Structure formats: C-alpha cells, structure tokens
C-alpha cells in the first residue's frame, strides 16, 4: 500500500504539489507515519500528536529565567539540583534522576542500565520501543525485543509467563526486563494494581520492570492519583518520564527507583551522547512543569479535550470509537471518504488504513473551540456524502 507523507490541504496549509508518496509495508495493520513535507512552512491545524503542540508559557518563562550569566556546565548547577528536588517531591527521596534530550534516548539508555546484549525485553506489539524507535534498542544495546499481542495496548502476566521458559538455557535470549507504556500507545491506562501485579511477577522471576512514561502525566490525571502511586509505590524499577508531550520544549528524564541500577548511568548517558552541557535549560523546564501542579493541569486539560472530542464523534453517523478514551488519545473508525476530505483541513494520522482507523490526539493547548470546529467539519462532511 502507498501512504502519503502529507495529504493535500487547501492553499492556506498544504498544496498538493508539495506532497511526496512512499510505499510502506503494513506490518500487522499498525500505525503508519504520514507527515507533511518538510518544505511546508505554515503551521498546521493538527490533531496528529501532542508533539505538534507548542510550549507552555510557564516553560518558556522558566527557560528565559535561567538564561542569565554563567553557571557550571553538565548538570552541576543549582538549577539542576533544584529540579532533582522537585522529582524527589513527586516520586520519593530514594530516586536517581538523569535528564536527556528525547524519549527514545530515555527508553534506550534506561533499558541499557538493566540489560546485556544476551538479554531480551518483553513488551507489547505496539510498544514505542519496538514500533517507533528505528531499532534503537537493538542497535545500541544489542538485545532482543519480544513482543506480545494486545488489543488495548496492555500486556498481562499470563502472556509474559509463556516467554520465560528459556531462562537459564544458554541457547536462548535471557528475559531481563518487562517494559510497559503508561499511558499506552492506544490511549488506555494501567491501573495501579495492574502495574503491581506485573512488577511482583517480574521481581519474583529476577526481572526488572521498565515503564515508558512519555504520557505518565496523562495517566496520573486520568486515574486521579499521584505520580508516585503508579511508579515507585507499585514496583517500577526504571521510568522514562515525559515532558515534551506535556508542554515542554524538549527534554525527558530517566528515573531510577533502585539506586544500584544507576551506578554506571552517568557513563551510559555520556556514551549515549545525551549529556547536555547547558543542562540548566532542560532542568528549568522540569522544575516549572513539576511546580504548582502544571504537569497535572496540562495533562488533565488534554484528557478532557480528548473525552469531549470522543463524545462529539460518537454522535456522527458511521463513526466508531475503538478504544477506551482514558488519556488524551481518541481512536476511531471513520469512513475512508470522510478521512480524505477531513485531511484537507486538518492533519492527523491514519492508524490502520485497512479498517480506516484514525488517531486524534489532544494537547495541553487544545481548546473547546478547536474541538467544536473539528467536529463541525466532520458533521458537514458526513452530511455532504
């Protein structure tokens, strides 16, 4: 099947002549990336991703506030120390925190602290580490990823058990880490007890539990719990904590809940090319995000906008919501003829082309008016066909 890099949008956004087409194999009917051409300069009206959103004003202000004078580089500055204290407030005193530039680095480097090249990491078939990190774990760690089928983005102990029979067998990759995503790639959320069951099973079998928390804030907001209650309190060993998807400009954090696992991480981060010389500009963002509940306000708002969108979409003929809307993602089956017309005005991803399933993401800066206008276009499209 051919998938566009960016569908034709009217003159005010994208011209058809600016579109490239590439052939892509449909692997298990999972998400295919179709981005606007790099030549495009004008901003899109987008429900594609929370990565498409801008930066929260408080974050910009925080960056500007530390942009004065000279400080010690590579994280030995007062701003980084202050940011780490904020993490201790939210996740507990007994944590080690390291800042990196992006989510792939957070995942790969965090995993590398637990995994040898002869090990395997067990995850879902839609896990970001398997689907959207360009084999980075395999390339930089040399480990094997073992993927489990899932309909809701979650994996369960019963599935994991089936892949532990090779423990101790020198001919087999040795399972060492279970990796889960919170909120999942399908917009669902693990409840605290679900995480604890997996963590207890992992530790009983001498495995570690890794959590990709790119949208952890959205999960906590959805569950109405503290960040600690779905990480440290339920047995997570290493966490990739996301900031970029929740209003930051850039930056993620790798959090270790077992200090021993972090013993060599400063070397791993440096070797992994993720040690920022001007660390204060990442640290200041995290301090702002974790102050005055900004992380919660941003995530809660994004979740609310996603639920509002889902409620409105359910009223549109021939559309079906396919996943529980528990965070800030809406998955829906929409007639293909709707999709092509909708994407003349809005950019979003086609998740499963065969089923005509799309993904819409709400962000901290999505407004009710944005949702209203989007749904209005869908309703008009439905009436016109």
PLM region spans:
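Buried hydrophobic positions in well-ordered alpha/beta secondary-structure cores of metabolic enzymes
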Residues: 47, 87, 106, 137, ...
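Conserved N-terminal alpha-helix of the aminotransferase class I/II PLP-enzyme fold
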Residues: 56-103, 126, 130, 136
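Active-site C-terminal subdomain of aminotransferase-like
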Residues: 175-184, 189, 222, 226-329
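Active-site phosphate-binding strand-loop segment of PLP-dependent enzymes
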Residues: 47, 155-213
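Conserved C-terminal alpha-helix-loop-beta "cap" of PLP-dependent enzymes
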Residues: 117-118, 307-385
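Conserved PLP-anchoring active-site segment centered on the Schiff-base-forming lysine
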Residues: 113-131
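N-terminal glycine-rich, Lys/His-bearing helix-loop that initiates the first secondary-structure elements
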Residues: 3-6, 28-74, 78, 89
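Intrinsically disordered, low-complexity segments used as extracellular stalks/linkers
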Residues: 5, 10, 15, 20-25, ...
């Amino acid at each position: 099947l051919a998938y566009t890099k960016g569908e034709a949008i009217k003159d005010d956004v994208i011209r058809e002549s600016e579109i490239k087409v590439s052939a892509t194999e449909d692997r298990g009917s999972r998400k295919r990336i179709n981005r606007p051409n790099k030549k495009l300069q004008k901003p899109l009206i987008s429900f594609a991703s929370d990565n498409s959103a801008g930066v929260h004003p408080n974050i910009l202000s925080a960056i500007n506030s530390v942009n004065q004078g000279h400080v010690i580089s590579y994280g030995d500055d007062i701003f980084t120390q202050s940011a780490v204290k904020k993490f201790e407030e939210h996740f507990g005193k007994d944590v080690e925190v390291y800042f990196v530039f992006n989510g792939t680095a957070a995942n790969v480097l965090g995993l590398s602290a637990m995994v040898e090249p002869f090990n395997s990491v067990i995850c879902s078939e839609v896990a970001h580490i398997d689907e959207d990190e360009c084999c980075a774990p395999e390339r930089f760690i040399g480990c094997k990823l073992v993927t489990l089928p899932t309909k809701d983005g979650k994996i369960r102990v019963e599935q994991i058990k089936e892949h532990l029979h090779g423990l101790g067998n020198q001919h087999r990759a040795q399972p060492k880490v279970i990796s889960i995503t919170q909120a999942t790639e399908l917009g669902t959320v693990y409840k605290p007890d679900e995480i604890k069951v997996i963590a207890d099973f992992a530790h009983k079998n001498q495995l570690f539990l890794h959590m990709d928390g790119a949208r952890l804030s959205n999960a906590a907001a959805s569950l109405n719990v503290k960040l600690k209650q779905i990480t440290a309190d339920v047995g997570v060993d290493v966490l990739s904590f996301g900031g970029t998807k929740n209003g930051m400009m850039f930056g993620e954090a790798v959090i270790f809940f077992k200090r021993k696992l972090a013993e060599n991480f400063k070397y791993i981060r440096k070797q992994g090319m993720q040690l920022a010389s001007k660390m204060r500009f990442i640290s200041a963002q995290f301090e702002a995000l974790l102050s005055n509940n900004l992380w919660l306000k941003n995530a809660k708002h994004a979740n609310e906008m996603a639920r509002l969108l889902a409620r409105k979409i359910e009223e549109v003929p021939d559309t079906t919501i396919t996943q529980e809307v528990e965070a800030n993602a809406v998955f829906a089956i929409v007639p293909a003829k709707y999709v092509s017309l909708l994407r003349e005005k809005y950019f979003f991803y086609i998740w499963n082309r065969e089923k005509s399933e799309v993904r819409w993401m709400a962000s901290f800066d999505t407004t009710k008016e944005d949702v209203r206008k989007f749904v209005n276009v869908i309703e008009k499209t439905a009436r016109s066909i």
